[in-house]
Amino acid sequence: MIKINDFNTQHISCEYADSVIKMERHFKMGNRYLSYILNERNFRDDIMLCPPSKLIKVIESFNLRFPDIDYDAEDWRYFRNYMIRQYERVRKGILHLVLNSLNLSVCPYCNRQYIFGTDNNRKVGAQFDHFYSKSKYPYLALSFYNLIPCCPTCNKAKGEECIEINPYIEGFENNGKLMVDSPLNCILRNADWEVKFKADDRCKTNIQAFALDELYKKHKDYAHEIVLKSVAYQKGYYNDLKISFRNIGITDETIER
């Protein structure tokens, strides 16, 4: 899993929020949940542009304001369905432009499938996952940093499942690495080797949600090629060191020690 480059996300997110506000000037009122996010909160700044690390605070504030939500009640179902409909309108009219602006070519969840935007509104080679489910947290349905551009495979795999790592904040970095469990067997093309993740608990949540272990096991040919190149590079680097140190009087025996 990779981090989404944030060099211009602030500009893009503001542009996105302003566009949505223009489209949705006439949000319907008369619902207590809508009244809360539109009147008691600054919908644009507090919710739509809420930084990814603070989305959980929005959830906590909402739960504090409405501690006893009846999820089967008519007012909640109206609010949920209304916010999801607004998202669907935005997705069709604006989000392909956001995707293009992010300059993101590969799915951040799996770092495997290519995604792309188009210059028209008919086709977008990515889907948008709600990091926090739009069904459970409809007030975040339009939050920019809750919308994760991803490939259809990852979007379907995750569904409404909660995961630990938001790619707007971080990727796996050094906490989730792909490893070859037996480099020697890999080099010799013996059957007994696998590509596996060495990961902490937070990364494991994402790995399980997107079945990344199974996905990367299918790429043993690529892993074999990478291991061979790594060995070749190290051998070439070692030979270069020997030549360089010989010139200053250091013997091969000393280098090998």
Each language-model region and where it sits:
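Short, intrinsically disordered, charge-biased short linear motifs at domain edges
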Residues: 91-98, 135-141
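Ligand/cofactor pocket segment of small-molecule handling proteins
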Residues: 134, 150, 154-157
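Short, exposed beta-strand "edge-strand" segments with a Pro/Gly-rich flavor and a Y/T-containing core
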Residues: 43-50, 141, 146-150, 159, ...
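Domain-level detector of nuclease and nuclease-like folds
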Residues: 157-217
